[in-house]
Design a protein with these regions (language model features):
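Short amphipathic alpha-helices in soluble, non-transmembrane regions
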Residues: 16-20, 81-87
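A short, acidic/glycine-rich surface segment
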Residues: 26, 34, 54-60
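A generic structural motif
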Residues: 32, 53, 119-120
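Core segments of cupin and vicinal oxygen chelate
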Residues: 7-47
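Vicinal oxygen chelate
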Residues: 1-10, 38-41, 57-122
């Protein structure tokens, strides 16, 4: 299993953005803990939202997430509802990809996601 830690200028704000799109808030370390980290998930795909401090220089901040697309799968039957729950982030239309998956792309908290439906046998 892989759980990426995404560098965010404010992990708590990023967590709220993901929550507003229907993601589950798994945990949120208190800001005073010294370890500002937030965990979110969507149908078993989990992300950790961390800080940029110590990981991303000031000059790199405008390029946060550049060139990265996180691909996650959700049940086919839920894809349209998940697309709708991301409406505030202006998701692309759901399309059948050249490899056969139905998916859409959306950017949440500066991170680009491709969310695809999968059939139960996958």
């Amino acid at each position: 299993m892989i759980r990426p830690i995404l560098a965010c200028q404010d992990p708590y704000e990023a967590g709220r953005a993901f929550q507003s799109a229907g993601w589950t808030l798994d945990f949120s370390q208190p800001p005073e803990s010294g370890d500002p980290l937030v965990g979110v998930s969507l149908y078993g795909s989990a992300l950790l939202l961390g800080v940029t401090e110590g990981y991303v220089s000031e000059v790199e901040l405008p390029f946060l997430g550049c060139g990265v697309v996180l691909y996650l799968t959700v049940p086919d039957a839920a894809l349209e509802a998940i697309h709708e729950s991301h409406r505030a982030f202006r998701p692309a239309e759901i399309k059948t990809q050249p490899w056969g998956d139905r998916a859409f792309e959306v950017t949440v908290a500066g991170w680009r996601l491709m969310i695809a439906g999968n059939s139960p046998e996958e």
